[in-house]
Amino acid sequence: IAIVSSPSGVDDGSFNQDNYNGVLKFIEENPNATVTPIREETGDSAAAVQAVADVVADYDVIVCCGFQFAGIGNLAQENPDTKFILIDSWPTVDGTEVTADQVIDNVYAAYYAEQESGFYAGMAAALSTTTGKVAVVNGIAYPSNVNYQYGFECGVKYVNGTEGMNVEVVELPSYAGTDVTGANVGGNYVGNFSDEATGKVLGNALIAEGVDILFVAAGGSGNGVFTAAKEAEGVKGIGCDVDQYDDGANGDSNIVLTSGLKVMHDTVYNVLNEVKDGSFKGANVT
């Protein structure tokens, strides 16, 4: 098994690590299996696909962590004996995303409803803020991250409407995101999933605007946001993808309010078991 990740690697304490934990659980139960973590250093989509192509002949199963790996569709068709687990996207073939019924036999691809956990994160933030200002910090404006952003905003709006509150979702125009279609989606985007320094700068900028609850969906960059929260007074963070309570430890206290779980490790673990028992089938699931 190979697992190819974004630049933040499989020890990012968030997205990549959750996928990796699914592999590790499978290996614990199947000690003859092995895993090789491969870190794609740039985050560029073409480079991500090339990183997979470079090792495709060496592994039975390749786990691809993130939207930037969507372009593996052609590669998968050219290598039918290799199984692919694609997280956060359906594959593209010749640059076009497949439809639900255009299954590639050796690709199990999974989308998640991030807007749902984002909604609850927004509710939690709106109900917990003392300053009346909250924000969401993302890495790159991939579809999954935009889902988190819009879900969060809707959660805050819902609380405002039902509880008679006026909580503001703060966005800094200089950190607005551009999605995969080229549209400006607003929000607060670090521009990377492995830039803790910029994450801290962005976190501090939001705190300076009065934000006291930060929903952090930025992978390794989010560690910098958490640092900014720890160094401030009365600021809380909401984790993403995994339970990030341990990341919130700050002396005798903890700055993590809650976390929005994605449970990708179960997907990876279950599909690896299907490979093992021969029941694996290509699929595009949500």
Language model features by range: what are they?
Residues 1-286:
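A residue-level marker of the well-folded mature domains of exported/periplasmic proteins
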